[in-house]
């Protein structure tokens, strides 16, 4: 009987640990140093190194999402949805969530933007590879987004990169 009580105690403790892990899981990526940012300015340079003296790799547009993979002083080492790596000055990015269309790179096929979170909803627009959206709301498998020109709708999450 004594071993039965110990088993029940261990079982309850296991469930408690599992519930705790589920509760803190969304914060683990941030705690591990994995975080996302988006370009705050209209045109921000992605550079080869953490200095204005380093060559420019790309010029990034407003809202472009980036994953932070390191830092040095006032500079962030980032990667984009195509796995390009470079450096941006940290005052030129924000924590406002954005997404970019990541599918159909080598085709002219565009993704559907819908009036609601599902394929049953009306198509209100289309977007091609590389188009950036502000993230408004997250649903199950779908994200409500807004384009800089005002179009708002839902896109299947698996077609996008960012947060």
Predicted regions and their residues:
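Boundary regions of SH3-family modules and the immediately adjacent low-complexity/disordered segments
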Residues: 32-41, 51, 55-58, 65-72, ...
């Amino acid at each position: 009987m004594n071993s039965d009580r110990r088993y029940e105690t261990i079982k309850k403790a296991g469930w408690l640990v599992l519930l705790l892990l589920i509760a803190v899981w969304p914060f683990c990526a941030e705690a591990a140093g994995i975080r996302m940012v988006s370009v705050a300015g209209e045109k921000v340079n992605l550079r080869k190194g953490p200095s204005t003296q380093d060559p420019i790799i790309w010029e990034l547009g407003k809202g472009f999402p980036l994953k932070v993979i390191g830092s040095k002083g006032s500079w962030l080492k980032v990667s984009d949805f195509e796995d390009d790596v470079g450096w941006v000055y940290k005052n030129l990015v924000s924590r406002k969530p954005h997404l970019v269309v990541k599918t159909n790179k080598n085709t002219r096929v565009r993704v559907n933007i819908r009036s609601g979170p599902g394929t049953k909803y009306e198509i209100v627009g289309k977007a091609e590879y590389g188009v950036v959206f502000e993230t408004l709301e997250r649903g199950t498998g779908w994200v409500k987004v807004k384009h800089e020109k005002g179009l708002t709708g839902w896109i299947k999450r698996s077609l996008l990169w960012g947060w």
